[in-house]
Each structure stands twice: as structure tokens, then as C-alpha cells.
Amino acid sequence: MPAYRSRTSTHGRNMAGARGLWRATGMKNEDFGKPIIAVVNSFTQFVPGHVHLKDLGQLVAREIEKAGGVAKEFHTIAVDDGIAMGHDGMLYSLPSREVIADSVEYMVNAHCADAMVCISNCDKITPGMLMASLRLNIPSVFVSGGPMESGKVTLNGKVKSVDLIDAMVAAADDSVSDADVEAIERSACPTCGSCSGMFTANSMNCLTEALGLALPGNGSVLATHADRKGLFVEAGHLIVDMARRYYEQNDERVLPRSVASFKAFENAMTLDISMGGSTNTVLHLLAAAYEGEVPFTMADIDRLSRRVPVLCKVAPSVADVHLEDVHRAGGIMGILGELDRAGLIDASLPTVHSNSLREALERWDIKRTKSESVRTFYTAAPGGVRTEIAFSQDKRFEELDADRAKGCIRDAEHAFSKDGGLAVLYGNIARDGCIVKTAGVDDSILTFSGPARVFESQDAAVDAILGNRIKPGDVVLIRYEGPRGGPGMQEMLYPTSYLKSKGLGKQCALITDGRFSGGSSGLSIGHVSPEAAEGGAIGLVEEGDLIAFDIPNRKVHLDVSDAELERRRAAMEAKGDKAWKPAAPRTRRITMALKAYAAHTTSAALGAVRVVKD
């Protein structure tokens, strides 16, 4: 029987000093025998996905106390990728994932917490907390802040759904008036919550449902809707029960590593492929698997991508479908239900809320549930009122979208595509693989070839695109932007958005050892491994070299002979200290924090996790 971790600091004569400090936080004699639950919050006024979390930690804390636990809240940092995008601030985004994971470990281990509720939402916060949960392996429940309502704007007399990607594309399109750009800007992000499409934040919050670590609805019910409050209330009660089951009944089934097993990671990746999730999820699932000592690799992702169809298409893959529409169609449990019927997931696995995923689907899949309350839950609709306040509206759709032939969520027979929404490509330019979001690629360019336009930084590529120096048929290649070369593996949302704004979204490709925002679409190939800074072949590409992409056959090929590549490699190595570094100087300032990250990070093919030798 494992002892409560917290008793290290709450029991015994020698802990009188520690108990004195606990008493100063409000604890009383009767509290020293209760489980201490960390409420890991991430409120900040910098991020719309987190502005409404300030009071939600205390909401969970009160429910923990009602259930017989002691709640102690702390906050992690949270970077807004959209605000950090397009300048050196993006160098800090991916490294912040490790900082978040470490900070959770530091706080939870330093204070001997028994379990935790993780209140996350945006891009690197959910992955960072997930990594910490699997690293610590103490009872954990995830509850996110929820998705933002989609924006609505009237242009030329027509109402259109918009998000921040539309604002970025419009701003760089000379044919769009200043007035229309401002109208889109003002409408794109109308409420608190994570941006409304299937971008990285929402993708990860959906995947926590598939991993079994979050309650049904976590990925899809809107931040503004009153129904979301129930998730926070339930999380507070559930975590106390889980702590007691583990520490008092020796029930290891509630531990993160028991729930998020190899098969659970397969389920999560299957979901991701089926809904065309962000390519960043590949990085984050690989990193979480590493922390949990789960042998889940790029090879598994490649294998799954070849058999899983696209059952759901959401912005940015399609313009007018957002998370509120996915929720109306049954949310993530609806997609998992279809994957289960197609025999593509293992529904026997446990979750934090049910004995098995199959048991959960019987209640939460709208195609099989007999519960009217569940059906009502999935009618939660946007309120259409600008607000930063959680749970502030209770609008409902008149009916569910249960059409699995033509609706938002399809069954396998009526899939949007028999080929999955993410793919791993291999070739001489990416020996260890690279990633493309196939759900966002137009069918006309699933095979594509063109001359390389080589850039040593994202900034240089942006200048060329906006300067009209990129032509139809070009392959924009951006290198030295990987985990080590950036450092920090910047997102390339601006280059992909600007290609769209120039009318080149279906006429050009972009390949990089950096990564893409969940908002990126088009023929955008990222995570090229090995990266240029590690001696990858992407560092040997020269202007005009032909690069060919064959997504159906999972291939990418640099049309340069092996002998020529070896000659170029030898010439590069002869540069000594200047080898495998940008040829042109870059103005970015690399601080000590970024240097420390670069010194220990690994390849994107490994999730860009940090490895420190013993």
C-alpha cells in the first residue's frame, strides 16, 4: 500500500516546522490526514485561452475540499503562440513546454502533493502538463479552459465565420481593403478560449480525452458555455476519489502511466489522424510518451497514418467548421465512437472516469446513448456575445448533427478521405522523417515537385513571399529553424498564411526543419529530421535543386545524386566551426535560456524532448 506522499511533510515530530508552515496556509489538524491535491492552473492576462482561468482554480479547489481533500493551487507560465508569432518571441514557445513540465515537477515534488488537477488550454501548456503528469505518475485529471467561439463578420453583405488565420491572410492580401481587414481583426477572436479551429491547443485538449485523462467534452464544449462548469466540478470530486483509490486501496489503474498506455497513445494518434489535428501533436505525443517511458515512436505514427481515414474536417482544413460544430456533432466521443465501429481503436482501455472507453462510449457517443442529458450536453452552442467570462451563456442548438454521411463527423463508409489527415514522409532529405497535415492539402497537389528556394530563416522567406519573389511551382525551403538550429523550432504560420494571401496556397510547397502552427494548411512539410543544425541533408540543398513530394506513397526526394550530396557534405564539414550554421548572419538574440535549451534538445523525430546525460 503506497503511503500518501504528503505525509512526508505533515506527519512526525520532526515535521513540526513544515506543519507550522502548512497551518499558515490555512490547514488545520483534521487536514493533515487528507490527500493534498495540487491544482495546477495557468491563468494569465496575456493569453485569451487563459484569461478566464483565474477563478476556475478556486472552483476546483472548493470541490476538492467538499470531497474531503486539501487543495493547493499554483500557476505555470503560458505563452500565446499567436502573439509570439512572426518575431523572436516564437523562439520561446516550444522551450516553454519543458519549463512548464519542470515547474509542475518542482512544485509537486517540493511540496509532496498526492495528486493533481491540470487546468490548461493553449498550445504548449497542455503538452507541458501532460509530460509532467507522466513523469510524476501520480493521479491526475486534465480539464482545459475550452475552445473560443468562432468569429462572425459581415463582408459584402454576407456573414462569414472567421478566426485569427483569416485576419493574418487578409492583412497580407493587397486586394482586401483596410476596412475589411479591420472588420476581420475585430471579429476573429470574439471570446475567451483557445482559438476556434482544430489548431494545436484544441487538438491537444481533444487528445487528452482519447488518452483517457480528461472528462468527455473536454476538447469541444465552449469556454463560454455554462455546461463547461460541470467538467471543473466533476474534476474536483474525481481527483479525490482517484487519490483514495491509489493510496488507500493500492489501485494503480488510476495512475497516468496505467491509463495513458501504449494502446492509449495509439488511440490518441488515431483520433488525431482522423480529425486532421495539428502537426504539433506529433511532437507533443512523442514527448509525452518519452516522459511516460512508453515506446511510442514515429514508426507507429507512420503505421497508423496508413490505415486511418479522415472522419472530421475542421478549420483550417475547411473554412467554416469550428469546434462548436464538432461539439454539436457529438464531440470527441462522437469521433471515437465512429473509430470504434470501424475497428480502429482499442475501446477496452481504462479512463479516469470510466472502467473502459467502451463503457464511456455507451453513455457519451450520441449514436448509441440513451441519456437525454448527454444529448442535451452536446447541443451547447455559441452565445454570439463578446466576453472574457467563462460559463457566461447557455445557448443551445435546436438539434444535434447526427448525420454521419454528410455531417461534421462522418462514419468510415462516408469518410472525407480514406487516407488519414497526417502523414510521415521519408526520403534522402528527411532520413528520420517529416510531417505533413494531409487534411489541409488540396488533392491537386498531393504529388508536387519544384525548384528549391532556399532561406536560412523564416524572416528571409517572409520577405521573399511579401516581395513577390516566390513564383507558382516553387518549393520554399526554410532551414536552421529546428529545435537546435533556431533554437526553439519556430512555427511557420506567417509564411504559409502569406503564401495563401498571394494566391500561392495551392501552387507552392513549403518544407522546413521548423514546425507549423495548428492554423497552417497547404502543402506544408515540417519537422524535417535530422535538422540542418544536426547535419541533416536539408542543410545541403542549394538554390534550384528539384524537390519532389509524393504524399500517397509517403515519399519526399531531393533530386541530387548521392555522390553530389557527399561532395557537399564534405565541403560543409570543411568549414569547421561554421559548419551546419546559417550562411547569412541572423539578427536574433540567443539568450542563455535558449542556449541551454539548444544544448539538450533532441530531434523533432523524438519529440524535441530534452535529454540530459547522467
From Swiss-Prot:
It is an enzyme of class 4 (lyase). Its cofactor is [2Fe-2S] cluster; Mg(2+). The active site is at 517 (proton acceptor). Its EC number is 4.2.1.9. GO terms for molecular function: 2 iron, 2 sulfur cluster binding; dihydroxy-acid dehydratase activity; magnesium ion binding. [2Fe-2S] cluster binds at residues 122, 195. Binds 1 [2Fe-2S] cluster per subunit. This cluster acts as a Lewis acid cofactor. It catalyses: (2R)-2,3-dihydroxy-3-methylbutanoate = 3-methyl-2-oxobutanoate + H2O; (2R,3R)-2,3-dihydroxy-3-methylpentanoate = (S)-3-methyl-2-oxopentanoate + H2O. Disulfide bonds: none annotated. Belongs to the IlvD/Edd family. This is Dihydroxy-acid dehydratase. It comes from Nitrobacter winogradskyi (strain ATCC 25391 / DSM 10237 / CIP 104748 / NCIMB 11846 / Nb-255). The lineage of its organism: Bacteria, Pseudomonadati, Pseudomonadota, Alphaproteobacteria, Hyphomicrobiales.
